[in-house]
Amino acid sequence: SAYARSYFIERPSLGAASARAGNVIGGGDWAVDRIIPDCVRAIESDKSIELRNPSATRPWQHVLEPISGYLLLAASLRKDPLAFVGSWNFGPTSKEVRTVLEVAEHLIARFDRGRINCESSAKIPHEAGLLQLNCDRANQILGWYPRWDFESTLDMTADWYKKVDGGEEANKVTKGQ
């Protein structure tokens, strides 16, 4: 990239790369207007899960997946800085890209309770219907692939919230995953 050529060309022992992840989910996210924490809050308070765009698809992945890719990239840059310079995407395979509705339905099944309400309002902000990442470079050059499929990702996410809500320490639950 131009940035790397501008600042790192005279230091061949130092490689620069940028990394991007798909839609990261997992335990510990309590932000507002994010699908997982919004679903968990609705389920736990016996309210409907409000979905703004149920048919939108996203490259969902557990937070630990891109972290493993980032660490592999960092180790590769350390071994051979110039060979791994550039942009990298870390995300699920295209067959694991699913809809917002499928995420909510899976969480309801894992919690054994909950209901969905699909909003239809003019106030809903525009969101892209389909998001995908091309992770071929990470797959082919680094040999990185996600370990968990869509179902496993959501199972681990639901388990994290259930265990922490049940009194287990968040740090221990995360390390156990």
Mark where each language-model region is:
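C-terminal substrate-binding subdomain of Rossmann-fold SDR/epimerase-dehydratase oxidoreductases
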Residues: 23, 43-177
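Flexible, glycine-rich beta-alpha linker
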Residues: 9-35, 57, 89
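Active-site Tyr-X1-5-Lys
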Residues: 1-17, 40-45
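A generic local structural motif
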Residues: 3, 36-37, 116-118
